[in-house]
Amino acid sequence: MHLRLLLVLLLMLPGLASASLSAQRLQDIRLEAFAACSNLLAFYNPNQQAADPRHLERYRQGFHGVQQLLAGQGDAALEEAAAEMRSRLEELERVPAGQVELYPDRIIPLLKAHARLDHRAAELYAAAPPAEQRQLTLHRLSLDIERLLLLYQSRAFSMIGMYVLDVDDNTVPQLDGQIHQGFADLAAQWPGHSAELAKLKQNYDFIRPRLLQHDRAWVPGSAAYYLGQVTTRLAQLDAE
C-alpha cells in the first residue's frame, strides 16, 4: 500500500511531468510564443509614427499564455527559455520612450530564447505527434503562417535577421508554398470544413502580396490582423 502511494506521488513530481506534455499543449505553447514575438516586433517597430496599443496587449497576452501553458509541466529547457524571454521582455519595456537604438540589444536575445523554446517544443512534439493526420497538417499549417508573419515583422529590424533568423532568398517563397499546400491537404483530409478553409485561404491570399513583395508598402498591422484571423480560426477548428 505504501509502495503504491509512493509511486503515485513520484508521478506527480514536476520533474516527471514533461513526459505528459501532449502534442496539443506543445502546439499551443508554440503558437502563443510566435504570436507574442510577432506582436512585440509590430509594437516596437521603429519605423512607425505611433505604436498600436493592440499589439502591446496581444504580446503580453501571448507571453502570459506561454507561462500558463508551461506551469507545472516540468520541462527544464522550455522553462529556462521562457524565463529568458520574460527577462528580456522586462528589459525592453524599461527602455525609455524614443530610444529605438536600444531595442535590438533586448530583442535579439529574446528571439534567440524563443528559438530555443520552439526547438525544444518541436523535439517533444516529434516524439509524440497527434494520432490524426489532419490535426498534424493543421498544426504544420498554423506554424508555417506564424513563421511567415514573424519573418515579415522582423524586416523592420535589419540587424535581427543577421543575428537570429536563419533565412535566405528562398525562405519566404518556400513557406508560402508550404502554406498553400497545407490548405490543399487539409481541405482534402477534412472535406466537411473545405468551404471554411477556402475562406481562410482567401484571407491569406489577400495579404500575401505584401508578405512576398518587399517593394510594397509596409503593413505590419494588416499582416498581423489577417494572418491572426487565419491562425485563430485554425486553432478553434483544432479544438472542436
Model-derived features with residue positions:
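Secondary-structure edge/capping motif, primarily at the C-terminal ends of alpha-helices
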Residues: 40-51, 70-73, 92-99, 124, ...
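Short, recurring structural edge motifs at helix starts
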Residues: 20-24, 126-129
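Extended amphipathic alpha-helical interaction segments
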Residues: 103-198
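N-terminal extracytoplasmic segments of bacterial inner-membrane proteins
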Residues: 24-51, 133-161, 224, 228-236
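Solvent-exposed loop and edge beta-strand segments that line ligand/cofactor-binding
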Residues: 21, 25-28, 215, 219
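Heptad-repeat alpha-helical coiled-coil/4-helix-bundle sensor or tether segments in soluble regions
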Residues: 54-116, 137, 183-217, 221-232
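N-terminal signal peptide c-region/cleavage motif recognized by signal peptidases
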Residues: 14-18
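Sec-dependent signal peptide recognition
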Residues: 2-9
